[in-house]
Amino acid sequence: MAGLSTICGGKVIMGLGLGTFQHEFAAAGYPNTLKDRANLARINAELCRRLWKGEKVTYKDEYFDFADVELKPQPKNMIPIWYGGGTPASCRRAAEYCDGWMPGRIPMLTFIKMVGYLRDQYQAQGRPMGTVGAIPIVSIDKDLDTALSKVNTPGLIKEGNNPSKKTWVNFGKFKTYEDIRGLLLAGKPEDVVKDTKEYEKNGLNHIVYDLRFRYADWYQQIDYLGKEVLPAVRAA
């Protein structure tokens, strides 16, 4: 991360989360309980910041054991750490030891609710509000129906009713695109602009448009974003 910061003039953000797959932790020789993964995330953030500050660090616990480690080169500036996740627990962790919160696929109503909770958590920690991001799936086309037909909309609706999403607003009742709007931004360019501005109105500072459902016409989506969506978002 420090080397990347040097190369790009400090324009780098570190994303942090608990991970998903147990076999990844097993391959690295780490325990994979939720408690252990939460501890590892917090400790990694703390150690990175100490090293980025130029400290020579000695550290030992059940996860790490090293002595007199220092970092060269130093980052251009202190690298912000954003916590990835869309649950109340992710908001608490972001407020405790991160500089921002970056949920992935999250419906608009749930985003609004979580941002309010996140703000409360930062206040409880006595810290200024962190940066708020989102990574919505995007599908842009000549009309909404065509845009929805190019992505697995039924699958996304089904995902919204999965028990793992029990903290989402209206969990278990998702039936239509409108129920998952925000998780998916679809329609004409002006529709995506409107939804982006709604995100911004409700506390969003940073957005990443996820085009991975439109690999077949990736460059068309890039053109829509670059020529129609982004100029309108910036001008609004």
Where are these regions (language model features)?
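Active-site-adjacent structural elements that line small-molecule/cofactor binding pockets in enzymes
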Residues: 1-236
